[in-house]
Swiss-Prot record:
Entry keywords, A to Z: Cell membrane, Membrane, Transmembrane, Transmembrane helix
Disulfide bridge positions per record: none
Coiled-coil annotated spans: none
Keyword Transferase: no
Membrane spanning residue stretches: 5-24, 29-48, 53-75, 87-109, 124-146
GO cellular component: plasma membrane
Entry membrane topology: Multi-pass membrane protein
Protein name: Uncharacterized protein AF_1823
Length: 154
């Protein structure tokens, strides 16, 4: 397993873990935050394959616009949990997850090849200011959403 495969696999695992966090959390605010983190990891997977337009679209639209609107709405609307999760759903979910994991493990026979192997060093140099700007923009928008929701001064 080469470093490219490892980076993509780790980003995929974190994306799956944070998407499970969206399903398991009972608070809309944290579900929106988990959704934004999930989309950032999906964008990281596309960045590993050197597909920059998709990364920019995911970062700007999904994380930026949709994530901030969802965070703002979820932070202002705090309702009680209307549904309970039945414990009997745990076993079928684990069985389906095990079947999917086994199918994926049996079909993954080769390493993932990246078209441009210098992509990871290029992201650090060529797109540093773009990534820093997008990260700063997302943090500022989330802070303003929290400020509006809680009506406090930061």
């Amino acid at each position: 397993m080469n470093i490219d495969t490892l980076i993509i696999a780790v980003a995929g695992l974190f994306a799956v873990a944070s998407s499970i966090g969206v399903l398991l959390t009972k608070d809309n605010f944290y579900a929106a935050l988990y959704m934004s983190v999930t989309m950032l990891f999906v964008a990281a997977i596309y960045a590993a394959f050197n597909i920059q337009p998709v990364v920019v679209i995911i970062a700007l639209i999904f994380v930026g616009a949709v994530g901030i609107v969802t965070v703002a709405i979820a932070a202002t609307y705090r309702a009680g949990v209307s549904r309970k999760v039945n414990i009997f759903w745990v076993v079928p979910v684990i069985v389906v997850f095990a079947i999917l994991a086994l199918a994926y493990a049996s079909m993954a026979v080769e390493s993932i090849e990246v078209v441009n192997p210098e992509v990871f060093s290029a992201v650090a140099t060529d797109y540093f200011f773009v990534v820093a700007f997008l990260f700063t923009l997302v943090v500022l928008m989330m802070l303003s959403a929290i400020k509006l929701a809680r009506r406090v001064d930061l």
